[in-house]
Amino acid sequence: ATRLSVFDFDETLAFTEAEIDILDQEGNVIDTTTNQEEYDKWEDDERIKSGELKFDYSELDVITNPTEIVAVTDIMRDRSADSDTQVMIVTARSSRTSDDIHRYIDAINIPTDDLYVKAMGDEGLGRGKGGFIFSILEEFPDIREVEFYDDSQKNITDVNTAKAQALEQEMVDVFDVYLVIDGVPQKA
């Protein structure tokens, strides 16, 4: 493959009904996030950083009522049909959802034979997508073109850092980053 196409899952390929609870030390629910913006606000909260409050990701272990985001899945469908492109889904969820994600992608008629799902949630952080993509470029020097789709501004910023490094080191010729807002990819 000479091109790497990387997609986030939630709010990028599909809208899902996942909620993340914020718990106090006794396990009481303090608040519930239903989208990326709410999660990002909480992630920056001092009480989360200090460990006074914590996220409960258990609901993310299953994919609930996914709704296809056609503007993005059409791109994925196109890339999957191209033998020079390696398609990946990189998600903040845990690997327990990998089979569900494969089944969903299969159900919307995108071939999954060569689809690679990387679940970052097992590493205890839903971040670091830039570092992950950079490590792929180091391992597979034939990849000269990268495209990345995600609805999280933090992930976009992280991947843009990897992009700058990869372009500076002439590892790639093209590295396009898209922020998906309300199901529409916009160059970021």
Model-identified regions with their sequence ranges:
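Short, aromatic/basic amphipathic alpha-helical patches
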Residues: 100-109, 157-169, 188
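Alpha-helical substrate-recognition element adjacent to the catalytic core
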Residues: 2-126
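Structural alpha-beta junctions
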Residues: 82-83, 108-114, 164-178
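A short, conserved beta-to-alpha structural element at the edge of catalytic cores
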Residues: 32-45, 168-188
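Cofactor-binding loop segments of dinucleotide-utilizing enzymes, especially the Rossmann-like FAD-
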Residues: 92, 151, 182
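Conserved Lys-Pro-Asp/Glu-containing loop-to-beta segment of HAD-superfamily phosphomonoesterases
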Residues: 3, 129-159
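Residues at the starts of beta-strands that form the adenosine-phosphate
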Residues: 86, 145, 176
